[in-house]
Design a protein with these regions (language model features):
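Sec-dependent signal peptide recognition
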Residues: 2-8
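N-terminal signal peptide c-region/cleavage motif recognized by signal peptidases
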Residues: 13-16
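Soluble periplasmic/extracytoplasmic beta-strand elements of cell-envelope proteins
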Residues: 26, 78-80, 106, 117
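Stable alpha-helical elements in mature extracytoplasmic
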Residues: 34, 38, 87, 129-133
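Mid-chain, structured segments of secreted extracytoplasmic proteins
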Residues: 57-104
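Beta-strand/loop substructures that line and gate deep hydrophobic ligand-binding cavities in soluble
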Residues: 101-123
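C-terminal partner/receptor-binding element of secreted or periplasmic proteins
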Residues: 115-142
Length: 142
C-alpha cells in the first residue's frame, strides 16, 4: 500500500512538473480560411490530416441541452495529423510521448478574433514536434 502511495505521488508530481502552453497567432480571416491554410501547410509537410474536429459546432449544438449560455468560442476547428519521422524522434527520446500523438493545430474565434494555435510542449524530447507545429502555423500565417 505504501509503495502504491509513493508511486502515485511521484506520478502526480511528474505530471505537474512540465506545463505545456498554447501558442496563439492572430489571423486576418475566417476560421474556414485559416483551417484551409493549416491543412495546406500540413500537406506541404508531406503529411495527411487524419481528422478535423468541428468543436465550435459541437459547443453550439450541445449548449442548449447542457443549459449553458453562448459558446465560449465562435467557430473552431482542430486538425489532427501525425508524422512518422517526428513521432519516432519524440518517442525514441521518451516513449511516454506516445500520449501526445496525434498532433494538432487549430483555428478558432476567441473573444471575437480569429486565431491559429497549437500546443507548445515543455519536454525537451518534444522539441521536434514543437518545430513541426511552428513551421505549419508559420506557413499558414505568412
Amino acid at each position: 500500500m505504501r509503495r502504491t502511495a509513493v508511486f502515485l505521488g511521484l506520478m502526480f508530481a511528474a505530471g505537474t512538473a512540465s506545463a505545456d502552453d498554447v501558442t496563439l497567432h492572430p489571423f486576418d480571416g475566417t476560421v474556414e480560411d485559416a483551417a484551409f491554410l493549416l491543412e495546406s501547410a500540413i500537406v506541404g509537410e508531406g503529411l495527411v490530416v487524419e481528422f478535423t474536429s468541428h468543436v465550435g459546432e459541437m459547443l453550439e449544438r450541445t449548449g442548449t441541452d447542457l443549459g449553458a449560455g453562448p459558446s465560449p468560442v465562435g467557430d473552431a476547428q482542430i486538425l489532427l495529423f501525425c508524422s512518422a519521422t517526428v513521432s519516432r524522434q519524440a518517442m525514441e527520446a521518451d516513449p511516454v510521448n506516445v500520449a501526445h500523438c496525434p498532433y494538432s493545430v487549430f483555428a478558432a474565434v476567441i473573444d471575437g478574433e480569429t486565431v491559429i494555435g497549437h500546443r507548445s510542449f515543455a519536454e525537451v524530447s518534444m522539441a521536434p514536434v514543437n518545430e513541426l507545429l511552428a513551421r505549419i502555423v508559420a506557413a499558414a500565417t505568412e
